[in-house]
Amino acid sequence: MEIKNKTRIGHVISDKMEKTIVVGIDVVKRHPLYKKTYRRTMKYLVHDEKNEAKIGDMIEIVECRPISKGKYWRLSKIITKGHIVAAQEA
C-alpha cells in the first residue's frame, strides 16, 4: 500500500530565514450558523534546501517528516515566479 503525502499550493510570504520560507494558503470557509463565506490565510513554515523560492512565487509544497518544531512541509516545485515591486525611497 502506497502512502501519498499531502500537497498544497500557495504563495511565498517571507523568505528572510535561512533554508526556510513562509507560505500562505488561502482557505475559504462557510460559517456554520450564518452561512457567510469568509477567507482565512493559513501560514506554513516550509523547508527550502536551495533557497530558490522568493517572495511572490506560487509554489507547491508537500508534507514530510518533522524537520524542526514548526516545519513539517518541504518545497516540491516552483509553479510561477512572482514579481517583486521595490519601494522607492523618497
UniProtKB/Swiss-Prot annotation:
Using the record for this protein, list the coiled-coil segments as residue ranges, or answer none: none
Annotated GO biological processes are:
translation
GO CC term, one of those recorded = cytosolic small ribosomal subunit
Q: Does the keyword Cell cycle apply?
A: no
GO molecular-function terms, A-Z: rRNA binding; structural constituent of ribosome
Q: Which UniProt keywords apply?
A: Ribonucleoprotein, Ribosomal protein, RNA-binding, rRNA-binding
Xref: Pfam families:
Ribosomal_S17
Q: Which family does it belong to?
A: Belongs to the universal ribosomal protein uS17 family.
Role noted for this protein: One of the primary rRNA binding proteins, it binds specifically to the 5'-end of 16S ribosomal RNA.
Listed under subunit, the entry gives: Part of the 30S ribosomal subunit.
What is the name attached to this protein's record?
Small ribosomal subunit protein uS17
Record gene name: rpsQ
